[in-house]
C-alpha cells in the first residue's frame, strides 16, 4: 500500500471525479454490508478497479477521510458547505444500524438531552448535536417536538454557538415555562487564545413560534470556588424564587459537586448558595448533568459522577448515571434529607448517560437519556454519525427505589401482535420467533425455578446472538451478554452486565428492539438495562435454550416507525 497521505489523496480525488459523495456513501455500504445497491455498485466497478476499491474500504473503515483536528472540530458552521451536510444526512439515513422509533441525530453526533419540557400544548426536548461528524465538536441544541412523547417532529437546530458567550459550544442545560414563553438556560463554552475554558450560564427565550432570542449577558459566571468545570444548569422554580443546580468541580479539593444558585428575578442577580448537601461521600472528581425531580412528591437527584470510587457504588461503565432519593429538599439551605447510604445506578446496562428528568404540569415525572457515553467509540462512527436518545420513561418510587416504565403512548407503535407460549424443544432450542425483524416489543414472563438463555438477534443456530441469561431459582440473576451479538466494541469495560433478582420468582421482561438498540425493562421497571449492539441485520431469531424445556408466555408486537 502506498504512503497514507498520497493514497488518501489519490482515492479521494478519484471519488470526487467519478461519483457524487452521496453515491460514494451508498457504494461504501454496498461493499461493507453487502447491500444490493445495483446502480452505485455497478457505477463504482465500472469506474474504479478492485485495488482502488480495497483502498477506499480500508480508508473508510479507519475513518481516514476526515482528520479531526481541534481546528476542524471548532470550525464555524458557516465554513462548512451545504453539500457536506446533505451528504452526511444521507449517510446517516442509509445506515443499517439506524434507529426508527428513537430520536437520533439528523447527522453527526448526538449527546445529552436538553430542555426537556411541556410548553404550548406540546412536549419538547433538545439534544446536543455536532452536525458535521461523529465527534465532540462545536455543539448546538437540536429541537424535537411531540404530541405524545413517542412521535417526535424534527424542528431543526435551535440554540447555536453564535455569540461571544458560547463561541465554542452551546452546551447542556434545561428549560422552564414562564408565562407564554419557554426559558432556556444553558452553558456557553468559550475558549480563549490560550485554549483556557470559560463557562458561562446563559439564558434564552423561545416563543410559541419556536423563535429563540438569547439574553445579551450571562446569568451566572463561575464563582471563585470552582474550576473551569462548571456546567449543565437545571433551572427550577420553588415558591417565589428561581433556583439553578449545576455540575461542578471544587477548585480546592478537585472533587465533584452540585452547585446551587438562587434569584428572585430570573434575569437579574443570581446568588451563590454553595453546594448541595446530599451525601457525606466523595463523588469523584466531577459531577455532570445534575437533575432534581420530584417523584411521588419525594425529591430525587439524578446525576453523573465521574471518577466515583467503585467501593461506594459498584458500576462497570466508564462513567455511571446515578440517583439519590430523599424525603425533603431545602432549597435555600441546599440540603437533601435522605437515608440512602450511597447512590444507585439509574440504568444497569451498557450505554446510558446524562439523563434529564422533569415534572410535567400534572406532577408526573418523566426522564430521557443519552444512549451513549463520553470517551467511547461506536461502530457507526465509521458512518459519520453516533448515538441516540432513549425512549421516554415515566418515574415512580417503590421502597425508596426508582421505578422506570415506558410511557403509555409507546403502545401506539404496536402493529400486529400475537401471543407466545411454551414451544417444544427442537435441535436444542425453543423458537419464540423465527423472523422477528428489527423493530419489535417482546413482553415475556419466564417461570420461576428455571435457568437458561433468551437469545435475541440470533442466527439460525443462535450461536451468534444477544444473550439474556437468567436464573429464576436460588441465587437468582439476570445478565446481558453482547459478546456474540455482532461487531464488538468498548470491550475494555466488559461485555456483560448482571443484576440480582428475587429468588424463586417469575421473571417479567418488557424488551424493546430498534435495529441497534435494546431497552430491557426488568420486573415492571425495577431495573432498566439499555445497550447498543451491532448484529448482522439478517439475524433476527428469538429463541430460548437451557438444560431442560423452559416455561414461558407473553406477547410479541412489531413496532412502527415513530
Regions found by a protein language model. Give the residues of each.
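Extreme N-terminal basic, low-complexity initiation segments
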Residues: 2-10
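Short hydrophobic targeting helices and cationic amphipathic motifs
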Residues: 13, 17, 29, 40-43, ...
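N-terminal, intrinsically disordered charge-dense segments
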Residues: 19-21
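Short, Lys/Arg-enriched N-terminal segments with co-localized hydrophobic residues
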Residues: 43-65
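Beta-rich carbohydrate-recognition and catalytic domains
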Residues: 56, 62-168, 172-232, 237-282, ...
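Beta-rich accessory regions
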Residues: 85, 319-562
